[in-house]
């Protein structure tokens, strides 16, 4: 996809409605600023009730934020557990983080994927796209090849989530173990290579992310015990080939990236059985799973796993977004 074709001059108006105005409360805080302020107050030791009083928001507003923004809910929960003294300085948006530490711009089609992972509707919609909302924890995205999804989402977004919350548990799945290992290697490099020193200094523990790590190998990594809850048994990031044994018991983010190719596109029944049995059961309470790739056939994993007849209620649970070139 030519990225220049994806950059809209203005966001499209949905459903023939007038664009919504993003209002500010009398204290001048936008919604995102209000969320950051609440996290700051909770990280300082205040209760949710007291924090809401300070930022002049209601309990209903807080509950709505939690429901609509899974990432916000995880950050608040981390702050409440007392292990988030760094939450305030870390709470950048993904585009801010990507630009500052990774020197990478987040384009609209990438932000759409991130929005869905975070439990939101895609911010940019176009008549050429297909969007079918479903459950917020099951996300499928189809788009043409060579769109940078692996670098921008599987690698950079996973890295962002680890920086925001070192207790994150991520599973990365690809068509082969070797391919998944390459994705994990890219994450490891950003956590240790001098090129990303600013990221490591601002977010990592004094000895580095790999110091005092339970494991730091080709298949899985545990962030340093100096920054991660030592009681957490599941890997920080685990790399799997489709159909492999899953080591971790739970995951906050599962990304299935390029698990279908011309060699296995016909094998969708086995792929679906493995995803439903081995992956969907491991999604944590506030977690989500993304399946992203390119359609290769009229019948493949991407179409068949959304078949309503595969589910007891005869309704597909997947939130689905297709973005053409």
Write out the residue ranges for each language-model feature.
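Short, flexible loop motifs at catalytic/binding sites
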Residues: 1-26, 32-325
